[in-house]
Amino acid sequence: MHRCTISHIDPDSPLRHAAHPGDRLVSINGNPITDVLDYKYYAYDPELAVCLRRPDGTEHTVHVSKPLGGELGLDFETYLMDNAHSCANHCVFCFIDQMPPGMRPTLYFKDDDARLSFLMGNYMTLTNLSEREVQRIIHLHISPINVSVHATDPELRSFLLGNPRAGKTLEIMRRFSDGGITMNCQIVCCPGLNDGAQLQRTMHDLAALYPKVHSVSIVPVGLTKFREGLYPLTPFTPEHAAETLDLVNAFGDECVKKFGARVFFCADELYLKAGRELPPEEFYEEFTQLENGVGM
């Protein structure tokens, strides 16, 4: 069954008398529908010409009216109306690689999907985006999105992510910035790899994209006992956590002076590891990175 095949029609849907389960959504106002982003974007308007394809292959177009931004009331085989895009990286710090065996299969799926970034807040690395997808994000103004940056040095980022394409991320982020796309970013900080001077460089490069780089969280690498055969990583010590806090907060202070916003925030875990008190509420401004363990 095609992913854009309708599985259910809401009783209050403006298409309740025209659409049936098993019909395929072909286009809205002449725009082909390939996934949930197309569907939500083109179904936003109040006046719609909806093309449906019956199971026998015949097509018909239905004209409907609804409130601006109102739902069409259609459900599909999957939420994305497509397969989720899987991760093409081999990150040295991947948390899924460190999970215990014997858990449900869905926990081992590595997604790296711009649609889930926009709709669900998942982080994406940009390494598996085609040129068409980059252009579509800009054209549809899919914003804000969450980007896992980790480093802006091309060679270092390629190493961290285990992907030679990873070095092109800053170039894509500049295109998104020029296209009006807001990005919230994260840096998984690994002692001896992307900390210190490399972290300073990454923050400097990302600050150059403010305000489209709206916020950046610095999160300590998480390590479990299930690391056999994986790259040897070093956990944060209290001293190293304190050094990282000082580096990031000093840079954030400069951003406050320059932009009126801190932009860069350390995860609560670094404060706890360093034995320091968490900052006051006003320090976290909009709490943009709350779900990434910042300001909880």
Annotate each PLM feature:
Residues A274-M296:
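Active-site loop ensemble at the mouth of alpha/beta enzyme cores that anchors a bound cofactor
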Residues T244-K257, V263-F264:
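C-terminal accessory region of radical SAM enzymes
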Residues E59, K66-K212, G222-L247:
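Conserved Radical SAM active-site core
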Residues D12-A18, K40-Y41:
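Short, surface-exposed secondary-structure edge patches
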Residues M1-D10, P14-L15:
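PDZ/PDZ-like groove recognition
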Residues L193, V213-H240, F259-E282:
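Flexible glycine/acidic-rich beta-alpha junction loops that bind and position SAM and/or redox cofactors
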Residues R16-T34:
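Conserved PDZ fold ligand-binding element
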Residues K40-F76:
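PDZ-domain C-terminal substructure recognizer with occasional recognition of PDZ-binding tails
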